[in-house]
């Protein structure tokens, strides 16, 4: 299995220099290496746009509901090696136009929320914005994966405004609760841990934990709903 790219629990890192190995690899497979570097910069800008939008929504909802629906925001730019491997799996040559056209998850933003209802509230608010276009939606909260994974996945197109042009870039967004994120993080560590075989028994135990996590989220949503009712009654 191919190890997933890592999300960083912080604002997007500054641009790093390519290693000599990366330069040789991509200069051999991708003649327009400087153009590739520019494309990655565009994706970084798209990540910043989406991250800013969620920060603004978080600020607005904190004023409206007296709490922050977003616990944290993580960002990820797919590594050069991951891009090359994914293009190979698709049977496609390493060309800029094909990379941009066929890989929808080069730029990634993960939003961790307190409650399941927050996930859908943030989704609705984001998709109402004029410069956001929904391309693809997969609701693994309503329909979890077989292994128990839960999260809401969106692929959106966002406009970025440069000095002399406007571009539309694709960004993958994952929205999930703290419980969903904890489970996914632990599952990933166990599944890809070096020198340890991932057994069927471990998979079954993780599936059981995923069900407990879903029950926890449901109870937290119920408590949140009751708190809203109680607050309304006091007014």
Named regions from a protein language model:
Residues 2-47, 51-60, 169-235:
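An acidic, glycine-/histidine-flanked metal-binding catalytic module
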Residues 13-17, 38-39, 48-49, 72-79, ...:
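Generic detector of short, locally flexible boundary/turn motifs and exposed helical patches
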Residues 21, 28, 35, 68, ...:
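Sparse, context-dependent recognition of short Cys/His-centered cofactor- or disulfide-binding micro-motifs
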Residues 24, 30, 50-52, 83-89, ...:
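Short linear motifs at secondary-structure transitions and domain/linker junctions
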Residues 32-83, 88, 92-97, 105:
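Active-site acidic/histidine clusters and adjacent loop/turn architecture
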Residues 90, 106, 116-119, 157-158, ...:
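Surface-exposed peri-terminal alpha-helical interaction modules
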Residues 100, 113-220:
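Long beta-strand-rich cores associated with HINT superfamily self-processing modules
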Residues 101-110:
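Glycine-rich, often proline-containing surface loops adjacent to acidic residues and nearby aromatics
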């Amino acid at each position: 299995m191919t190890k997933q790219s890592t999300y960083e629990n912080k604002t997007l890192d500054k641009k790093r220099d390519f290693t000599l190995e990366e330069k040789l690899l991509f200069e051999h497979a991708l003649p327009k290496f400087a153009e590739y570097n520019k494309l990655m910069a565009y994706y970084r800008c798209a990540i910043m746009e989406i991250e800013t939008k969620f920060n603004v929504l978080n600020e607005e909802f904190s004023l409206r509901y007296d709490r922050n629906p977003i616990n944290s925001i993580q960002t990820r730019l797919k590594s050069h090696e991951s891009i090359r491997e994914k293009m190979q799996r698709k049977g496609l040559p390493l060309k800029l136009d094909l990379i941009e056209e066929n890989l929808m998850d080069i730029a990634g933003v993960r939003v961790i929320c307190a409650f399941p209802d927050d996930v859908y509230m943030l989704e609705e608010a984001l998709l109402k914005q004029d410069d956001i276009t929904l391309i693809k939606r997969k609701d693994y909260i309503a329909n979890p994966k077989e292994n128990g994974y839960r999260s809401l996945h969106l692929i959106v197109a966002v406009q970025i405004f440069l000095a002399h042009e406007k571009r539309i870039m694709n960004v993958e967004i994952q929205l999930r609760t703290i419980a969903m994120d904890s489970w996914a993080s632990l599952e990933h560590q166990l599944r890809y841990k070096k020198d340890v075989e991932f057994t069927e028994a471990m998979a079954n135990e993780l599936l059981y934990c995923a069900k407990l996590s879903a029950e926890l989220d449901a109870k937290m949503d119920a408590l949140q709903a009751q708190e809203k009712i109680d607050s309304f009654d006091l007014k």
